């Protein structure tokens, strides 16, 4: 096995401050278990931790049992890549199967939300239930970890007992939206080595080191769906109920295969051609009428039916675990990679808030998460219960 001290990266040396002998000695007392996904971000994160003097071991999590004939999750290939990187870095790689926990705590909730007509975000739930709960507990209790680490593009500030969650330095890759359910305690038990650098630098470090994952494509989509079509996947678990597509005025303009296949603000894939007596402006989904099984659409990107003045959110998680009891000015994202929206939080009770936007917003989607910020600090968030017109 390659000794970890033999590997070096000029790119790393350029972008990371050299630690003092005292800092290295202090870090050497700490054991870090890094979640190795078989991707470039966790691969480079492991190297960075080694350079910072920590005792580093990897853990590969298998969270989904594929069908034998349809290996969509590429788990075998990802494990092989994670093992190749671990071997290159001279690092032990543990393996664990969390498929049962994933099914019970992530996947069943995902299906139930779709049944209820909402559009859930399983990545957020996976981080909450698997990566920063099952993994964190296993690493601490079974592997003796002082910290866990992941390849997420986020940062932390403050000491371990009073840590804050910050956006990643790379605005294009910032993943704090997916981690808003973490408590300050969980953040304090976690390290995010690539949060302070930009993605191209991560790739360059991997190339410097000759890692197998250096040119590997970023994973897209939800793990358990992989590269297959979302519609085909969902149909295996939930019976579809076709119905009518109507305009806000009640005019029938088409048919849908099932409300669960559609989300608010959606334009593509509606299958509505030119409709006699209507303009050629594209149609957008503005409502899912569950009672009548009707998909309601409106024409034009700026149609007032698409706009929301705010939202109601529940299932709140604040990073500092202190409920908000007074009105608060901040910004919010109602979906990943959205530009921040200026808003005011108005608490209704400790688990429900009203959020009023400074400017009306399109496609505020029940089931998705609203995540709040003050500057770079992620305050926390909640699940959108309803949009306010």
Swiss-Prot record:
UniProt xrefs under CDD domains? MnmA_TRMU-like
Which residues are tagged with the site Interaction with tRNA? 152, 368
Molecular function (Gene Ontology), one example: ATP binding
Top-level taxonomic group: Bacteria
Q: Which UniProt keywords apply?
A: ATP-binding, Cytoplasm, Disulfide bond, Nucleotide-binding, RNA-binding, Transferase, tRNA processing, tRNA-binding
| A Pfam entry, by short name | tRNA_Me_trans
Q: What is its main location?
A: cytoplasm
**Region entry Interaction with tRNA: which residue ranges?**
173-175, 335-336
Q: Which GO terms describe its biological process?
A: tRNA wobble position uridine thiolation
Q: Which residues bind ATP?
A: 35-42, 61, 151
| Disulfide topology | 126-223
Places the protein is found = Cytoplasm
InterPro entries in alphabetical order: MnmA-like, MnmA-like_C, MnmA-like_central, MnmA-like_central_sf, Rossmann-like_a/b/a_fold
- Which HAMAP family did the record assign? tRNA_thiouridyl_MnmA
Q: What is this protein called?
A: tRNA-specific 2-thiouridylase MnmA
Tell me which species this is from: Actinobacillus pleuropneumoniae serotype 3 (strain JL03)
């Amino acid at each position: 096995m390659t000794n970890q001290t033999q590997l070096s990266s000029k790119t790393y040396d350029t972008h990371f401050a050299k630690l003092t002998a005292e800092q290295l000695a202090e870090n050497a007392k700490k054991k870090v278990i890094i979640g190795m996904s078989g991707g470039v971000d966790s691969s480079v994160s492991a190297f960075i931790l080694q350079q910072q003097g920590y005792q580093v071991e990897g853990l590969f999590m298998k969270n989904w049992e594929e069908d034998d004939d349809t290996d969509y999750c590429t788990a075998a290939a990802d494990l092989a890549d994670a093992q190749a990187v671990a071997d290159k870095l001279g690092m032990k790689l543990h393996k664990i199967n969390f498929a049962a926990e994933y099914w019970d705590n992530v996947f069943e909730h995902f299906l139930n939300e779709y049944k209820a007509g909402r559009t859930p975000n399983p990545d957020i739930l996976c981080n909450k239930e698997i990566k920063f709960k099952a993994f964190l507990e296993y690493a601490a209790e079974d592997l003796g970890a002082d910290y866990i680490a992941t390849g997420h593009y986020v940062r932390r500030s403050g000491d371990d007992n009073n840590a804050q969650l910050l956006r990643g330095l790379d605005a294009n890759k910032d993943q704090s939206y997916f981690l808003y359910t973490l408590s300050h305690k969980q953040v304090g038990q976690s390290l995010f080595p690539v949060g302070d650098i930009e993605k191209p630098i991560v790739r360059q470090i991997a190339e410097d080191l000759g890692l197998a994952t250096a040119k590997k494509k970023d994973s897209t989509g939800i793990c358990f769906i992989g590269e297959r079509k979302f519609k085909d996947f969902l149909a295996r678990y939930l019976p579809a109920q076709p119905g009518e597509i109507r305009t806000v005025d009640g005019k029938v303009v088409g048919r849908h295969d099932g409300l669960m296949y559609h989300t608010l603000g959606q334009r593509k894939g509606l299958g509505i051609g030119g409709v006699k007596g209507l303009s050629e402006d594209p149609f957008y989904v503005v409502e899912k009428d569950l009672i009548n099984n009707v998909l309601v659409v409106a024409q034009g990107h700026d149609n007032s039916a698409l706009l929301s003045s705010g939202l109601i959110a529940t299932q709140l998680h604040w990073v500092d675990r202190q409920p908000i009891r007074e009105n608060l000015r901040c910004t919010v994202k109602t979906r990943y990679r959205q530009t921040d929206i200026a808003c005011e939080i108005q608490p209704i009770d400790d688990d429900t808030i009203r959020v009023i936007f400074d400017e009306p917003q399109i496609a505020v989607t029940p089931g998705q998460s609203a995540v709040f910020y003050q500057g770079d600090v992620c305050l926390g968030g909640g699940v959108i219960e309803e949009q306010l017109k």
